[in-house]
């Protein structure tokens, strides 16, 4: 058995499907939505529309993972400038604030983990007091289609606009896609005049290593 990123995530996807935590239809909808949202992202690598018929006809990489369910391996770079409170107001009258960051890791041994949930995400919800926050936008570092409905349910984002950039399914810059998610959340708060945004970054097999960031516009 391969332990590559795609292969190991097949294990998680099979478990989530078997336990009825996610569905095939949710994954297909994720791919279609990502391609539609790619129109909002000038840096997206994949912008062609995907219909239900196209998705169903796509070849399997490793059942039940199709090509459309996987991210394009992308080259690029990201940078972020974080300023102190007094310095931020030298650049803008309306800075976006980092209200909280939670960053933790789970075991690299897949056999010792419960792949139907995520303790690091659950800890972030508690540590950042996210349960009672109504988020306006979310950007998740979800490299495979099954991760989107999984994380949206864990983070209570089912009705929150998510990955309006298309997310990693339309452009997945190696070692930068998580930082991109934070930057895209910032951009949404600036351009849409929204109040609360949540960003997520991850690395390791099956969402092993997770960072959750709460961004806020102060009124």
Language model segments and positions:
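Claisen-condensing/thiolase-fold acyl-transfer catalytic domains that form or cleave C-C bonds
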Residues: 61-219
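Single conserved hydrophobic/aromatic residue that forms the stacking wall/gate
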Residues: 1-7, 11
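Secondary-structure transition/hinge residues
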Residues: 17, 35, 39, 189-190, ...
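Basic phosphate/pyrophosphate-binding loop/patch that engages nucleotide-derived ligands
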Residues: 18-23
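A short structural micro-motif
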Residues: 33-37, 141-144
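Polyanion-binding loop/helix "lid" in catalytic or ligand-binding cores
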Residues: 25, 29-33, 39-76
